[in-house]
């Protein structure tokens, strides 16, 4: 973060603007809209500045910049066409610990002014840190079209309701749910937009009288294979509404950065063959937080119903009578194969695909004869530590030694690595990658050189 975003309360605060041209005019409008007591210093002023002074909206001081003008000021803006003067204003301001903005000089300024979308009291600010002001402007224009004008009225009503909500709902979680319901009311916003405050008040009163919102619930959310862009829209909504996030090690840092900032985060990561947190303890953690009336998200890498123990956790919730729902995710097989240029099925190479876990509760549960059959693609999850066994069993049951294979490490992320070779090399290649990795076995791997589009580190045996 190059710049710390902050909104300043400037109402009745003395501020200095140095510059009297059209650019300075735009800054003056913003400062006056914010309620600042504005002094403007310049050699010449546009007619608009002179009109503002006649109207008593600001004070004009003609002449060269005098550092004494900064005395008692909270904020300064240098908006002249003379860079020497602008830098003098900046230096004198910083010497007095006064924030100073130099217009159109992102690298030589004390603070920058973002593009804004004004739906007062709701304000949206967009900034590129001076690197791409046109991009910031384009984003502001998109937001202007997206955010209706009456949002400000909704925000005003919310401000008047704060004390009533605090008195009515005893916990932060309940208050948050009330606000989410309120802001989801399209009819309320429409009533305010139409000026029908009576109807709007009736809709608000109905929310206070609605069914209790203190029942806890758990949502099982698939976080996808790593790339945060592959998280579903519904999954994003759930993690941004949750009171508690219980997540494992396969959830990427990029996805976790999207979680609501004030949500409680509980890590229950597990490694193959070593359960950092026993499954029974994870189940109990879900139950405990849901029973406290919280909105809990169990966030799992990939899809929770594909080798994610999602079914086991939901059985525990169902037995306890806890409400739950499931948001599927893109499983690792789909994500890693797509980002590696390896289609899992292809009319010329594979008419079916099998998703197989490299770890089972008992040896021998897998039908290796079926797995070794031609015309299919095998995808092994959590198979690195069992690579030697996988290689041995497939060869024993008739799979050709030169069957192409690929190991995908950290699939779909910028850290993705793909190591390829043949079945006889699987045990050796497995030592060259780290978990989390996926093993893909089948003729479709030969398509990778032509179909790979995601550029990352790759290696061939």
UniProtKB/Swiss-Prot annotation:
Residues 216-461 are annotated as: Uroporphyrinogen-III C-methyltransferase. Residues 1-204 are annotated as: Precorrin-2 dehydrogenase /sirohydrochlorin ferrochelatase. Coiled coil: none annotated. S-adenosyl-L-methionine binds at residues 225, 301-303, 306, 331-332, 382, 411. Its EC number is 2.1.1.107, 1.3.1.76, 4.99.1.4. NAD(+) binds at residues 22-23, 43-44. The active site is at residues 248, 270. Keywords: Cobalamin biosynthesis, Lyase, Methyltransferase, Multifunctional enzyme, NAD, Oxidoreductase, Phosphoprotein, Porphyrin biosynthesis, S-adenosyl-L-methionine, Transferase. InterPro entries: 4pyrrol_Mease (IPR000878), 4pyrrol_Methylase_sf (IPR035996), 4pyrrole_Mease_sub1 (IPR014777), 4pyrrole_Mease_sub2 (IPR014776), CobA/CysG_C (IPR006366), NAD(P)-bd_dom_sf (IPR036291), Siro_Cobalamin_biosynth (IPR050161), Sirohaem_synt_dimer_dom_sf (IPR037115). It holds the Pfam family TP_methylase. The modification Phosphoserine is found at residue 128. It catalyses: uroporphyrinogen III + 2 S-adenosyl-L-methionine = precorrin-2 + 2 S-adenosyl-L-homocysteine + H(+); precorrin-2 + NAD(+) = sirohydrochlorin + NADH + 2 H(+); siroheme + 2 H(+) = sirohydrochlorin + Fe(2+). GO terms for molecular function: NAD binding; precorrin-2 dehydrogenase activity; sirohydrochlorin ferrochelatase activity; uroporphyrin-III C-methyltransferase activity. GO terms for biological process: cobalamin biosynthetic process; methylation; siroheme biosynthetic process. Pathway: Cofactor biosynthesis; adenosylcobalamin biosynthesis; precorrin-2 from uroporphyrinogen III: step 1/1; Cofactor biosynthesis; adenosylcobalamin biosynthesis; sirohydrochlorin from precorrin-2: step 1/1; Porphyrin-containing compound metabolism; siroheme biosynthesis; precorrin-2 from uroporphyrinogen III: step 1/1; Porphyrin-containing compound metabolism; siroheme biosynthesis; siroheme from sirohydrochlorin: step 1/1. In the N-terminal section; belongs to the precorrin-2 dehydrogenase / sirohydrochlorin ferrochelatase family. In the C-terminal section; belongs to the precorrin methyltransferase family. Then it catalyzes the NAD-dependent ring dehydrogenation of precorrin-2 to yield sirohydrochlorin. Finally, it catalyzes the ferrochelation of sirohydrochlorin to yield siroheme. PANTHER family: SIROHEME SYNTHASE, SIROHEME SYNTHASE-RELATED. This is Siroheme synthase. It comes from Edwardsiella ictaluri (strain 93-146). The gene is cysG.
